[in-house]
Amino acid sequence: MTSAEKSATRNIYDPSALPDYDTQFIKPDELHQFEKALNAPAAAPLVAINDWRPINQRVRKNRRTKPRRSKDETREGVLYTVLKWPFLFIVFAWITVLGIAYALTRLYIFLYEQCVTWRGKRERLRRELSVQTNYRDWLTAAQALDTHLGNQKWKETDEYAYYDHLTINKVVAQLKQARKAAESEVHNGRSGVSDLPAVEDLCALLEACVKNNFAGVENPRLYSESYSGTKDLVQEYIDEVQACMQLILDSKQIPAEEKYQHFKHLDTNFGRTALCLSGGATFAYYHFGVIRALLDNDVLPEIITGTSGGALVAALVATRTDEELKQLLVPALAYRIRACHEGFTTWVWRWWRTGARFDTVDWARQCSWFCRGSTTFREAYERTGRILNVSCVPSDPHSPTILANYLTSPDCVIWSAVLASAAVPGILNPVVLMTKKRDGTLAPYSFGHKWKDGSLRTDIPIKALNLHFNVNFTIVSQVNPHINLFFFSSRGTVGRPVTHRKGRGWRGGFLGSAIEQYIKLDMNKWLRVLRHLELLPRPLGQDWSEIWLQKFSGTITIWPKSIPSDFYHILSDPSPERLARMLHVGKQSAFPKIQFIKNRLKIENTIMQGLQQSSPGGDRVLLPILSRRLQNRAQEHADAMVERLDHSFPERHSDYKDESHYTEVSDSLSTNSSRPHTPDARRGSIFEEMRRQSAVFFDDPDMYGDEDAIAT
């Protein structure tokens, strides 16, 4: 190790090198206001008897009042009372048996993979993959493993059952031809879309194909058959779409208003990408490694949501710039994580007196450093351009959850939302959200009502993100320990293919995967039966079945691999050495997903750039995070981008006829295609069409509804 490397290693363990390490952002008066709000009496709802009678005053009521029912009407009945506990005992006993069988099945699959799959050279290449510390070296090792396993041949073949390769072939050919004609028109100097028919055709083509998961090109299965990348045809399609949009964006002849309407249409159809950080107590520190991997490769989404422990990480990311994050996401950050610094006797006595292990005001003081003091959601967005979202659940079980962000609660103080999202019953008592007034002082938010852990109901708020920000592509970093135990992808996941039978097999063989799926779905079924029959007890007034039966995955799900000692330290502060390991594991778990995320953001960032530069008024200034990302992408990936056409471009052969926006491609252009592809022969009979349809598979992770259970 050179002297420079030794110095760099010392710096990442030196707390004094952290930005604002000794800064105390929060003011004592703000903590006092928070403590006062916590100790205030519960807010009573103001209810009038009718429209004309006053409230909070004595009134003469009718003496004939109906007696209030003291029982839950849905739980009355002789059979319910007699059968509830025996049925509950039998079901729990059966779930226990299924749990033991599941553990034995997973042990069998583990031994099967170690003894049958990972042997010889492939095992050596896999070990080299697991020790890489940066994405460039990891990608080199992944490509070597793909070459050894024969995955490169799979990339070169267009046909695949999980996307429509025929449509993608035709669209790529049409885009290339339309881009060539549009460049010729733009270079001639004419202005206005009406005077540029080729540009108008190109815009129509883009509006037809720039959509979320168009023809299945964003199906995770396309990235689950190799360690690096996807089908060559899919990569060519993404590069060509980005090049065509860049042509429209750079054109001086197209009026800004027409550009804006075009990119607004694309933005609505394509949607946005969000990073979702799950809860999981101290397991949430694995998120730091995931964030660091995405940050180093310029693929960190602007929309970030966090729940419970993930909310603390999301708050740190949303309140710091990229440069500050690169200095903060190092092992020395462990010196600032002091939430569990109290001794055993202290927290036991507090739990006995208050019902919570940790002190809320002390946690507010510790958490405020990660949020840069009493920063609000609006202030964080204005400082970094990132959109922070935090899930909070009201202490009243009948009230809806809230996704706090700069739209729904712009003046809400971030650290109060983070505390509320982490207020697990028995760990931290429900918390009052705080809002910042115009004079800078703090006051209770939402009439002083209290909130608690968001992961109890909505660990991953996909629906709310789609409602507020048109998010339809989610990157989920999932570290909940009770969910990670049941994570198993029988056919591989993004960047982690099944090596058995060259990716065509099942983990542990078909029998092992079938048994695993059956047991997991059976446990899921019985938990749902108990919940729908209202047989589950509700300790602390909480329906705990939600921690199993909600949806915990996204379009891309990152699962950092935990170790047994993490369960022992689940409520303790990490040491620098343990945080260094969690950073490495988090980065390793994110590396296989980066190429998929890059392809998604390549199109999304170009759309956002078009909206920013062509929007009317004074909104044409690029956000710092977007402009910096676009500059880095242009510098690092210039060799991979499709260049402008100055001469005849070799086209792919297509039999696609003129329909809607598409036109026929000349056969002379197909002979010089630089990439081997599957012939686009027209199907000659109904039997051929039936054969093709029967070979198409639909990978639907939501087949059991929005509240999918234990992760699959």
UniProtKB/Swiss-Prot annotation:
Q: Which GO terms label this protein's molecular function in UniProt? A: triacylglycerol lipase activity
Q: Which UniProt keywords apply?
A: Hydrolase, Lipid degradation, Lipid metabolism, Membrane, Transmembrane, Transmembrane helix
Q: Is Nucleus tagged as a keyword? A: no
Q: Which Pfam families match?
A: DUF3336, Patatin
Where is this protein chiefly located?
Answer: membrane
Q: What is its EC number?
A: 3.1.1.-
User: What subcellular locations does the record give?
Assistant: Membrane
Q: Name one GO cellular component term.
A: membrane
Provide the leader sequence positions: none
Span list, region Disordered: 1-20, 649-686
The record places domain PNPLA at: 275-466
What are the Basic and acidic residues biased-composition ranges?
Answer: 649-664, 677-686
Identify its protein family. Belongs to the PLPL family.
The function of this protein is: Probable lipid hydrolase.
- Protein name listed in UniProt: Patatin-like phospholipase domain-containing protein ACLA_029670
Output the lineage of the source organism. Eukaryota, Fungi, Dikarya, Ascomycota, Pezizomycotina
